[in-house]
Amino acid sequence: SAFFFTVAAYHSWALPRPGSDTRNSSGRSAADIFKEFFDTFRSFFRKKQIWVAIAFMLLYRLPEAQLVKLINPFLLDPVDIGGLGLSTSQVGFVYGTVGIIGLTLGGIIGGIMAARGGLKKWLWPMAWSMSLTCLTFVYLSYADAPSLLTVNVCVFIEQFGYGFGFTAYMLYLIYFSEGSHKTAHYAICTGFMALGMMLPGMAAGWLQETIGYR
């Protein structure tokens, strides 16, 4: 807690204060607050190509949304039912250490590439990166007793691709939220982002029980 307090105090001092970041000291009635609340949603859904944007928010992470719910069960389940039969400690290292390293590196490199070439140039490569790297788990599901090293490499590739591809997703949300009420609009976008993970994830377990890991 002391560390977080120190970091928060530093950021309070170091971060810039743009002119738009000012406290509204004028007295407002409850009716005005509710009116602004609904105006925020109204202006969001009146944005240009809003339904295309919502479809993008919901579908961009579709493969990952289904995969992420089943990674741990797949790694832990016995071999005779299609899993890899890893121990809990092995899964902790594979997904909690190697996977996090891949995710972090992918995000850093994705940010560098997007800063140099822009979102328009990197959107499709990042989208393919997020989806195609999920095929590493297709390989693991068909591989005959893959070694722990192979599992680590596959998880690293998949998580690296996810981190790299997620950069484009976050930049798109930021760009789409620009304009009036941009902070509130970004919050609404993150709600659709969460929905895009939750809905496919709800069906992932049913699909696995129906067709198995293969």
Spans of model-derived segments:
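A membrane-interface helix-boundary motif in multi-pass transporters
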Residues: 1-2, 206-214
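Loop-to-transmembrane helix entry/capping segments in MFS-fold secondary transporters
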Residues: 88-89, 179-189
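Helix-to-loop junctions at the C-terminal end of transmembrane segments
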Residues: 105-124, 208-209
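C-terminal ends and interior cores of transmembrane alpha-helices
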Residues: 128-146
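Intracellular juxtamembrane helix-capping segments at the cytosolic ends
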Residues: 164-178
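Juxtamembrane intracellular "pre-TM" segments in multi-pass secondary transporters
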Residues: 19-52
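C-terminal membrane-cytosol helix-exit motif in multi-pass small-molecule transporters
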Residues: 2-22
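Short amphipathic helix-loop junctions that connect adjacent transmembrane helices
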Residues: 60, 69-91
